[in-house]
Curated annotation (Swiss-Prot):
Coiled coil, from the record: none
Name of encoding gene: mdh
Source organism (scientific name): Halorhodospira halophila (strain DSM 244 / SL1) (Ectothiorhodospira halophila (strain DSM 244 / SL1))
Signal peptide: none
Protein name: Malate dehydrogenase
Active site residues per record: 187
Pfam family, one: Ldh_1_N
Length: 326
């Protein structure tokens, strides 16, 4: 059996946390041969609820769980962490402007970045799940100057999985028969789910669906799926978000399947004309615990306009919190 690794989860008593922790504990994220120590962070007023989740985790008697820490201290939760899932974030309240939401979360993620900088493993892998995820990842990264900027990512795997589901439903195939889908940009309504390099059962997707459907139905449906789930369920997507977080971390840690890519929001290196430093979703491959942006894809005018629109939104978000960045 391997030595245990430390997995920190913030917002651990919340809905996504509840859907996430039992699957991590069962080995679905890092493998059935990888023991884990769970380091769970919650705000003081949620500590009792967190204890309830810890009791349930204990009652599962998971063979892979080496230990559980529950705390309201970021330093304690992040100490020597190998993997960190930043799930906890301030939700948007009634009448709250996006700028207010950005500022409220900037305070949370600045403090968490500083704690990671102080106590986490130097090769820690960090995933921002809580929204606005891309900008929260950027704020965390900027507050952890001693860590590699590439260690900080944001989740667009939920958008990627949503796009797979819409496309497979449309053509009547299984999602595993789709290759080459990409989600570009921000985890927001400006994201661009792109099928232009996509194949379904080995044939170009563009030959199997009409462009009008892609433009008028597919893209808006994926962009608005989160809102549609809130309307239907009366609560935001939790289980699907947790599942996507596991997918993201599993691929980053263990690698993407040979010949396939996925979508991750990572620091731009200037690829595809996207401003360097923005946390932007690209198609990536993962190998040996590292990710690489897929290079050399052609970009037509339709894609370019959408890729630039979502980049502009990310630049606006960054500028809105610039006074709070180190």
């Amino acid at each position: 059996m391997k030595a245990p690794v430390r997995v920190a989860v913030t917002g651990a008593a919340g809905q996504i946390g509840y859907s996430l922790l039992f699957r991590i504990a069962a080995g679905e994220m890092l493998g059935k041969d990888q023991p884990v120590t769970l380091q769970l962070l919650e705000i003081p007023q949620a500590q009792e609820a967190l204890q309830g989740t810890v009791m349930e985790l204990e009652d599962c008697a998971f063979p892979l769980v080496d230990g559980i820490i529950a705390t309201d201290s970021a330093e304690e939760a992040f100490r020597d962490a190998d993997y960190v899932l930043l799930v906890g974030a301030k939700p948007r309240g009634p009448g709250m402007e996006r700028k207010d939401l950005l500022e409220a979360n900037a305070a949370i993620f600045s403090a968490q970045g500083q704690a990671l900088n102080a106590v986490a493993k130097r090769d820690v892998k960090v995933l921002a799940v809580g929204n606005p995820a891309n900008t929260n990842a950027l704020i965390t990264q900027r507050n952890a100057p001693d860590l590699d900027p590439r260690n900080f990512t944001a989740m667009t795997r939920l958008d990627h999985n949503r796009a797979l589901a819409q496309l497979s439903n449309k053509v009547g195939c299984h999602s595993t028969e789709i290759r080459g889908l990409a989600v570009w940009g921000n985890h927001s309504a400006t994201q661009y789910p792109d099928i232009s390099h996509c194949t379904i059962q080995g044939r170009p997707a563009a030959d199997q669906v009409e462009h009008a459907w892609v433009k008028d139905t597919f893209i808006p449906t994926v962009q608005q799926r989160g809102a549609a789930i809130i309307k239907a369920r009366g609560a935001s997507s939790a289980a699907s978000a947790a599942s996507a977080a596991i997918d993201h971390m599993r691929d980053w840690a263990l690698g993407t399947p040979e010949g396939e890519w996925t979508s991750m929001a990572v620091p731009s290196d200037g690829s595809y004309g996207i401003e360097a430093g923005l946390i932007y979703s690209f198609p990536v491959t993962c190998r040996g615990g590292d990710y690489k942006i897929v290079s050399g894809l052609s970009v037509d005018d339709f894609s370019r306009a959408r890729m630039d629109q979502t980049a502009a939104e990310l630049a606006e978000e960054r500028d809105a919190v610039a006074h709070l960045l180190p």
